[in-house]
Amino acid sequence: MKVNHNHISNTGVNDSEDILEAQDEISIDNNKNQENIWNKKSIFHTWLLLCYSTGPVASMSRTYIPASIQSIAKNVGKTKMNQPCGTQGNDCYVKFGFMTVHHTSYVLYLRAVSTAIEGVVAIFLMGIADYSNYRKSFLIFSILVYGFLALPFIGLTNNDYQTLVLASILYSLLIIDDSIYQILEGSYIPLFMRADKKNPMQRGSVVAVLGLFLGNLGGITALVIGIIISYLSGTPESKGYHNFLLAITIAGCLTIGLSLFSALYIPNVQGKQRIDNFLVLPFKRFFNLLKDIQKYPMAFLYCISWVIWNVSFNNFMSMFLLLFRSTLGLGNSDAEYTVYTFMSYICSSWGSLVWMFLYQKWNSNIKYWGYSFLSVSLLANFWGCLGIHKLTPLGYQNRWEFWVFEVFYSATSSAMRSLNRCVYSSLLPEGNEAQYFGLEVTLGIASGWIGGLVNAVIQDRTNDDRFPFLPNMFLVVVSLIVYYYVDLQKGKNDVNNGNS
């Protein structure tokens, strides 16, 4: 009996083609369903509520927590003459591991070490997030941990070294967890953008701005609570930073409650099919990501500019807020500090919203907005450098300088952060959102801890709180130069060619 092998072969080929066509149809249907989900207003509002839930603890980790650690370090520390530290001035030193450092530098050293650990976590997360079917669960869990880490601060009222160490550990864990939820939260922005086929860039600007605005609004809520506590609960001299500790714990409760409510309605994201083991995947994807530089050069170039600017922004804010208290006096300026940090978040929210409305109205070249925002960053750091010379009456040595630059720097920096998230999302290949947002966080961490360490060493060795503004100013200059060479249109074309 003869068998028609050609018939069998052709039949096998036809079956394979039918299977591939069916898989393509299923993939197209899944993509359409995903687009329909991310077009729903209810889903967008739930995501915004989730952004709001991170705001209370995020604002505390940038304001009250480092201020509290600074105060505890001052109470524990000694002067060069082995006397108790005063409320003003720089003559105060405290033990940090195996060395003794300036009490303000202690916070900068702590942040540098925590950021280095944060980088390892970010590399692992950016490698697995796009392949996981539990992105929603990871996001909610990271925000819950964020809230729970803030709860113990209410008990850290003792002025001893053990309390300082415990506060430092909690602060470090908050910094590490911060990168986790930022990577996962930011990876949702491209999903909302791609759901709008008509004008994804305008959609992205709205999503990025409102997400940041709601986060700031959550921070404002916690800071209002801090103001009420500070002005109703005793004098600054009697209560001091203890008011901060209560506000931090209340912020943790808000974050936990709101994140649990959002978890009921936020949709999950279907992960990509993976072949490698989860332990191998992060490192393999990271090296594959570096190979994509030739394919998406503008995305990488923009990422570098964003990372350098973001490092300078974080350095500036940490130095600026600590300098405010050391210049005006620890303890007796605490009530004013609550209003000061509150105004920072008000200006941040105002800045990003104004930019969103102006951009939608004029729809001018989005890159020119970046130039103007970066110019303000350059001016703010240059102004701080003026104070290095002791005979100069300017350079953040007067109360009015802190308040004026707080308004302009906070507003333009918030707008710049929204702009970066929007533009960067338009340069990312589809299906790799978490990986590329993780790249931004990872590169920021890899370079940020070095910048923080350099600033801490400079401040510690020079005993000058304003000297670190000098290297920070050069970071802004480098960011501006890299930003100049980014061709946004070419970057978008690269993505379209890669997805086609």
UniProtKB/Swiss-Prot annotation:
Keyword Transmembrane: yes
Entry keyword annotation includes Membrane: yes
Membrane topology, record value: Multi-pass membrane protein
Main location: membrane
One Gene Ontology CC term in the entry: vacuolar membrane
Alphabetical list of InterPro entries matching this protein: Atg22-like (IPR024671), ATG22/LtaA_families (IPR050495), MFS_trans_sf (IPR036259)
Glycosylation sites: N14
One Gene Ontology term from the biological process aspect of the record: amino acid transmembrane export from vacuole
Residue stretches spanning the membrane: 108-128, 137-157, 164-184, 209-229, 244-264, 304-324, 339-359, 368-388, 438-458, 467-487
Keywords: Autophagy, Glycoprotein, Membrane, Protein transport, Transmembrane, Transmembrane helix, Transport, Vacuole
Pfam families membership: ATG22 (PF11700)
Highest taxon listed in the record's lineage: Eukaryota
Cellular location(s): Vacuole membrane
Family label: Belongs to the ATG22 family.
PANTHER family: AUTOPHAGY-RELATED PROTEIN 22
Protein task: May be required for lysis of autophagic vesicles after delivery to the vacuole.
The protein's name in its UniProt record: Autophagy-related protein 22
Biological classification of the source: Eukaryota, Fungi, Dikarya, Ascomycota, Saccharomycotina
